[in-house]
Structure formats: C-alpha cells, structure tokens
Amino acid sequence: TIVLACNAYLEKLEKKIAGKIMPINNFMLATEPLDEDEARYINKDNVCAHDNKFHVHYFRMSQDNRLLFGGGENYTTKFPSNLKSYVRNTMLDVFPKLEKKKIDFAWGGTIAVTVNRMPHIGKLDSGVYFSHGFSGHGVAMASLAGTIMAEAIDGLSKRFDVFNEVKIHAYPGGTLLRW
C-alpha cells in the first residue's frame, strides 16, 4: 500500500491531485511578553482565535504572555527578507495598540490550501491513498487524516468514505501558475 502524505510538498509527484492544492507560505510571530492587563485586553478569555477573512489571522497567548500571531502569507518560493516586519504589519492591522511592542521571534512554513479550504483525502484509481490541503489546520487534520487512511487500509473505511466523497475542485490553471 502506498500513501502520499506530502501536503504542500507534493509538487508534481502525482499530477492528478497536485492541481487541487496551492502551496503558500504562512508566517507567525511572537511579541515580547505582555503585562497581564495587555494580555487580557488582547485575549480576555485566553483562547485560541481566528477570523474568517480570506487571508486568515489567528492568535493566542503563550504561557509567558507573548502574543503568538499568525497572518500574512506569500505565494513565492522565498520568505520575506524581514519576516518580523512583514508579519508585524499584519498584526498591527488587527491590534494597533501593540505598535510599541517588540517582536522577539518570527517564523514560517509552507502549507497547502484547497479552493474550498477542506482537506483533500482520498484514493486514486491506482490504489494510492493520499491526504493534503489542510489549509492551515495541518497540526490537527494531518494526524486525523493519517488515522483515517490507516483505518481504510485496514478495511474500516466509514470515515475515509466521508472525506473521499467531498468534491475538491482544481485551481484554475492547475499547477501552471506555480513557483
């Protein structure tokens, strides 16, 4: 049994499904520690949160009261030269009161996004299982997809069949407009 679990790194390994994801770079930052009042102003219930914009912003507080903020992406093979500044500008659109706060860390990675933001989990005619297109939810969804594919390979396909039936459309142009 073969399983393709490449997410954004599928590239041209399997052309039948490569056009159904768009690899994008997504970035995060961590501010300097905020005092308790600042932290509660930003996130009074200390929960993970995100908005519903096309380019999603997401955030939570760390144990030491740093704002962990994700937002800002690009569609090239390179990360911005000043990642802290790049993400900071996006953060300030959401939290302008943090203008004077220092950014201690910034990082990023490449994710795979589907047109409808649903994960693409299925089986090719050749019998190859695949999962990708977690659209920024890969930490949780990739583990679930692995479990679902393992169940299907073991003959328990009920949950797999649900995802396999979800129609994932290809991006216009497929892989032609990629890096």
Where are these predicted regions, by residue range?
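Active-site substrate-recognition segment that forms the wall
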Residues: T1-E36, R40-S126
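C-terminal lid/capping helical subdomain adjacent to the catalytic/cofactor pocket in oxidative enzymes
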Residues: D125-F130, F134-W179
